[in-house]
Amino acid sequence: MSRVAKNPVAIPAGVEVKFGAADVTVKGALGSLSTALCNDVEVKLDNGQLTFAAKNDSKFARAMSGTLRALLNNMVNGVSKGFEKKLQLVGVGYRAQAQGDTLNLSLGFSHPVAHKMPAGIKVETPTQTEILVKGADKQLVGQVAAEIRAYRSPEPYKGKGVRYADEVVVLKETKKK
Protein backbone atom coordinates (compact mmCIF):
# COMPACT_ATOMS: atom_id res chain seq x y z
CA MET A 1 0.00 0.00 0.00
CA SER A 2 1.14 3.54 -0.72
CA ARG A 3 2.40 5.51 2.28
CA VAL A 4 0.20 8.44 1.22
CA ALA A 5 -2.91 6.24 0.99
CA LYS A 6 -2.44 4.90 4.53
CA ASN A 7 -3.58 8.24 5.97
CA PRO A 8 -7.36 8.76 5.83
CA VAL A 9 -8.91 12.02 4.61
CA ALA A 10 -11.02 13.74 7.28
CA ILE A 11 -14.27 15.25 5.98
CA PRO A 12 -14.98 18.59 7.73
CA ALA A 13 -18.47 19.80 8.59
CA GLY A 14 -20.30 21.31 5.63
CA VAL A 15 -18.61 19.05 3.07
CA GLU A 16 -20.63 16.33 1.34
CA VAL A 17 -19.08 13.39 -0.57
CA LYS A 18 -21.17 11.44 -3.10
CA PHE A 19 -20.03 8.35 -4.99
CA GLY A 20 -21.31 7.73 -8.51
CA ALA A 21 -20.82 4.72 -10.77
CA ALA A 22 -17.31 5.70 -11.84
CA ASP A 23 -16.74 9.06 -10.16
CA VAL A 24 -16.85 10.90 -6.85
CA THR A 25 -18.29 14.39 -6.24
CA VAL A 26 -17.33 16.64 -3.34
CA LYS A 27 -19.65 19.56 -2.50
CA GLY A 28 -18.90 22.35 -0.06
CA ALA A 29 -19.26 26.05 0.65
CA LEU A 30 -16.97 27.08 -2.22
CA GLY A 31 -18.49 24.87 -4.91
CA SER A 32 -18.50 21.33 -6.23
CA LEU A 33 -15.64 19.26 -7.65
CA SER A 34 -15.67 15.85 -9.31
CA THR A 35 -13.07 13.29 -10.36
CA ALA A 36 -13.04 9.83 -11.90
CA LEU A 37 -12.44 6.80 -9.70
CA CYS A 38 -9.90 4.11 -10.54
CA ASN A 39 -11.20 0.53 -10.78
CA ASP A 40 -8.14 -0.78 -8.90
CA VAL A 41 -8.70 1.40 -5.81
CA GLU A 42 -11.34 0.86 -3.13
CA VAL A 43 -12.59 4.06 -1.45
CA LYS A 44 -14.74 3.85 1.69
CA LEU A 45 -16.52 6.58 3.63
CA ASP A 46 -17.01 5.80 7.33
CA ASN A 47 -17.11 7.96 10.48
CA GLY A 48 -16.49 11.13 8.48
CA GLN A 49 -13.27 9.79 6.96
CA LEU A 50 -12.31 8.55 3.52
CA THR A 51 -10.06 5.49 3.51
CA PHE A 52 -8.20 4.13 0.49
CA ALA A 53 -6.97 0.62 -0.33
CA ALA A 54 -5.62 -1.07 -3.44
CA LYS A 55 -7.93 -3.88 -4.63
CA ASN A 56 -4.98 -5.97 -5.80
CA ASP A 57 -1.25 -5.93 -5.09
CA SER A 58 -0.12 -4.56 -8.46
CA LYS A 59 2.28 -1.64 -8.58
CA PHE A 60 -0.28 0.41 -10.54
CA ALA A 61 -3.04 -0.15 -7.94
CA ARG A 62 -0.74 0.85 -5.08
CA ALA A 63 0.37 3.98 -6.93
CA MET A 64 -3.19 4.97 -7.86
CA SER A 65 -4.39 4.59 -4.27
CA GLY A 66 -1.95 7.30 -3.18
CA THR A 67 -2.76 9.46 -6.19
CA LEU A 68 -6.51 9.22 -5.59
CA ARG A 69 -6.05 10.01 -1.90
CA ALA A 70 -4.06 13.16 -2.77
CA LEU A 71 -6.66 14.26 -5.35
CA LEU A 72 -9.60 13.78 -2.97
CA ASN A 73 -7.73 15.52 -0.14
CA ASN A 74 -7.17 18.53 -2.42
CA MET A 75 -10.84 18.48 -3.44
CA VAL A 76 -12.03 18.41 0.20
CA ASN A 77 -9.65 21.25 1.15
CA GLY A 78 -10.64 23.20 -1.96
CA VAL A 79 -14.40 23.17 -1.38
CA SER A 80 -13.97 23.98 2.33
CA LYS A 81 -11.04 26.45 2.47
CA GLY A 82 -10.09 27.14 -1.16
CA PHE A 83 -6.69 27.69 -2.74
CA GLU A 84 -4.90 30.84 -3.80
CA LYS A 85 -1.76 31.82 -5.68
CA LYS A 86 -0.18 35.24 -5.33
CA LEU A 87 1.70 36.83 -8.23
CA GLN A 88 3.82 39.99 -8.30
CA LEU A 89 4.60 42.29 -11.22
CA VAL A 90 8.15 43.66 -11.17
CA GLY A 91 9.09 46.29 -13.74
CA VAL A 92 8.51 49.93 -14.63
CA GLY A 93 4.98 50.44 -15.97
CA TYR A 94 3.85 46.86 -15.30
CA ARG A 95 0.24 47.00 -14.08
CA ALA A 96 -2.65 44.63 -13.45
CA GLN A 97 -6.36 45.39 -13.11
CA ALA A 98 -9.19 42.92 -12.50
CA GLN A 99 -12.51 43.65 -14.21
CA GLY A 100 -15.09 40.96 -13.52
CA ASP A 101 -13.75 37.68 -14.88
CA THR A 102 -11.04 39.36 -16.99
CA LEU A 103 -7.55 40.36 -15.89
CA ASN A 104 -6.09 43.29 -17.84
CA LEU A 105 -2.30 43.36 -17.85
CA SER A 106 0.10 46.05 -19.03
CA LEU A 107 3.44 44.26 -19.37
CA GLY A 108 5.53 46.48 -21.62
CA PHE A 109 4.12 45.13 -24.87
CA SER A 110 2.73 47.45 -27.56
CA HIS A 111 -0.73 46.15 -26.66
CA PRO A 112 -2.56 45.39 -23.40
CA VAL A 113 -3.03 41.72 -22.48
CA ALA A 114 -6.52 40.57 -21.43
CA HIS A 115 -6.66 37.16 -19.72
CA LYS A 116 -10.15 35.65 -19.35
CA MET A 117 -10.63 33.54 -16.22
CA PRO A 118 -12.20 30.08 -16.52
CA ALA A 119 -15.29 29.13 -14.52
CA GLY A 120 -14.58 28.62 -10.82
CA ILE A 121 -11.62 31.02 -10.67
CA LYS A 122 -11.73 34.49 -9.11
CA VAL A 123 -8.99 37.06 -9.58
CA GLU A 124 -8.27 40.06 -7.36
CA THR A 125 -5.75 42.88 -7.59
CA PRO A 126 -5.12 44.33 -4.09
CA THR A 127 -2.54 46.70 -5.63
CA GLN A 128 -1.56 47.43 -9.23
CA THR A 129 1.44 45.10 -8.95
CA GLU A 130 -0.18 42.19 -7.07
CA ILE A 131 -2.49 39.51 -8.43
CA LEU A 132 -4.43 36.99 -6.32
CA VAL A 133 -5.82 33.93 -8.12
CA LYS A 134 -8.41 32.08 -5.99
CA GLY A 135 -10.52 28.99 -6.50
CA ALA A 136 -11.59 25.58 -5.21
CA ASP A 137 -9.69 23.49 -7.79
CA LYS A 138 -5.99 23.38 -6.86
CA GLN A 139 -4.89 22.26 -10.32
CA LEU A 140 -6.88 25.00 -12.09
CA VAL A 141 -5.62 27.75 -9.74
CA GLY A 142 -2.03 26.71 -10.43
CA GLN A 143 -2.68 26.43 -14.18
CA VAL A 144 -4.18 29.94 -14.41
CA ALA A 145 -1.32 31.40 -12.34
CA ALA A 146 1.20 29.69 -14.65
CA GLU A 147 -0.58 31.07 -17.74
CA ILE A 148 -0.46 34.62 -16.32
CA ARG A 149 3.23 34.20 -15.42
CA ALA A 150 3.99 32.91 -18.94
CA TYR A 151 3.01 36.25 -20.51
CA ARG A 152 6.22 37.77 -19.15
CA SER A 153 8.29 35.40 -17.01
CA PRO A 154 11.09 36.99 -14.94
CA GLU A 155 14.15 37.74 -17.05
CA PRO A 156 17.52 36.72 -15.57
CA TYR A 157 19.39 40.06 -15.66
CA LYS A 158 17.06 42.56 -13.97
CA GLY A 159 14.31 40.24 -12.72
CA LYS A 160 11.54 42.12 -14.53
CA GLY A 161 8.36 40.20 -15.25
CA VAL A 162 5.54 38.33 -13.52
CA ARG A 163 6.65 36.08 -10.67
CA TYR A 164 5.09 34.07 -7.89
CA ALA A 165 5.16 35.84 -4.51
CA ASP A 166 7.40 33.16 -2.99
CA GLU A 167 9.62 32.76 -6.08
CA VAL A 168 13.29 33.65 -5.82
CA VAL A 169 14.77 34.87 -9.10
CA VAL A 170 18.53 34.32 -9.23
CA LEU A 171 20.01 37.20 -11.22
CA LYS A 172 22.90 36.69 -13.63
CA GLU A 173 25.91 38.95 -13.59
CA THR A 174 26.26 41.23 -16.62
CA LYS A 175 29.18 40.86 -19.00
CA LYS A 176 32.26 42.82 -17.89
CA LYS A 177 34.73 44.36 -20.34
From Swiss-Prot:
Function according to Swiss-Prot or TrEMBL: This protein binds to the 23S rRNA, and is important in its secondary structure. It is located near the subunit interface in the base of the L7/L12 stalk, and near the tRNA binding site of the peptidyltransferase center.
Protein family: Belongs to the universal ribosomal protein uL6 family.
Descriptive protein name: Large ribosomal subunit protein uL6
Any one GO molecular function term: rRNA binding
GO cellular component, one term: cytosolic large ribosomal subunit
Alphabetic keyword roster: Ribonucleoprotein, Ribosomal protein, RNA-binding, rRNA-binding
Oligomeric and partner information: Part of the 50S ribosomal subunit.
BP GO terms, sorted: cytoplasmic translation
Organism: Chromobacterium violaceum (strain ATCC 12472 / DSM 30191 / JCM 1249 / CCUG 213 / NBRC 12614 / NCIMB 9131 / NCTC 9757 / MK)
Gene, per the UniProt record: rplF
InterPro entries, alphabetized: Ribosomal_uL6-like, Ribosomal_uL6-like_a/b-dom_sf, Ribosomal_uL6_a/b-dom, Ribosomal_uL6_bac-type, Ribosomal_uL6_CS
PROSITE patterns reported for this sequence: RIBOSOMAL_L6_1
